[in-house]
């Protein structure tokens, strides 16, 4: 039994009295969920012990989704240190869709691609290039994003947009200016929105995570307008 480590008490009979009438209100927040973050060693060891693999399977995620739904949630960022949710087992994404769970991704996993997918696929897909850079490898990165969107387009999702560096790092070198960073992020998001319109639909829900240094790019300064003043993301979710 996996229900927050609480084993239900067994009873021979259960009586529901007619006087008991509880109607739960509809949640006021549209997207409600959690991120399985920094999953090693706790989540990973549990997955290995109970399901035989550090790479979570649909059999494992069924319990996670059930827990999420019992908590009145509907949205998840899957584990991504040692696993790639859709690439390892696409059945994970299909199961989430079947159970009514909306799948997103963290601040550095845009366009339905898990954090480790590029490191894995660039070894076998030369069309993606080898550098995680929208300055030197924009064409390859765009193909990588496009294929992720096409793979997951029929599953309900909240698509993360934006871009950070590999392994949860800064995207640009340390000597890059605020304007440099804002401009490359704008270029990446513009391309992502074009791909989303082509592969899914333009009005599909999208999220930009304002995390760490991205907050500086969002705010800008007195000399450099930030992303908060950019009309292209005006209708998107800012987190």
Identify the residue ranges that each predicted region occupies:
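Feature activates predominantly on carbohydrate-active enzymes
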Residues: 1-138
């Amino acid at each position: 039994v996996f229900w927050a480590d609480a084993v239900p008490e067994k009873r021979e009979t259960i009586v529901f009295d007619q006087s008991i009438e509880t109607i739960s209100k509809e949640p006021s927040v549209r997207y409600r969920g959690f991120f399985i973050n920094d999953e090693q060693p706790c989540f990973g060891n549990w997955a290995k012990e109970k399901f035989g693999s550090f790479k979570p399977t649909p059999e494992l995620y069924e319990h996670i989704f059930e827990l999420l739904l019992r908590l009145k949630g509907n949205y998840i960022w899957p584990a991504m240190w040692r696993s790639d949710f859709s690439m390892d087992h696409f059945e994970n994404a299909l199961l989430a869709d079947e159970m009514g769970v909306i799948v997103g991704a963290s601040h550095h996993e845009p366009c339905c691609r898990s954090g480790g997918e590029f490191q894995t696929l660039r070894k076998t897909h030369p069309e993606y290039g080898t550098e995680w850079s929208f300055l030197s490898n924009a064409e390859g990165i765009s193909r990588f994003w496009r294929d992720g969107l096409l793979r997951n387009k029929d599953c309900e999702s909240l698509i993360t947009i934006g871009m950070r560096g590999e392994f949860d790092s800064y995207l640009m070198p340390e000597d890059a200016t605020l304007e440099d960073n804002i401009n490359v992020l704008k270029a990446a998001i513009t391309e992502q929105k074009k791909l989303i319109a082509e592969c899914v639909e333009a009005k599909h829900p999208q999220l930009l995570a304002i995390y760490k240094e991205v907050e500086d790019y969002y705010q800008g300064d007195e000399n450099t307008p930030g992303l908060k003043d950019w009309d292209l993301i005006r209708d998107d979710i800012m987190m």
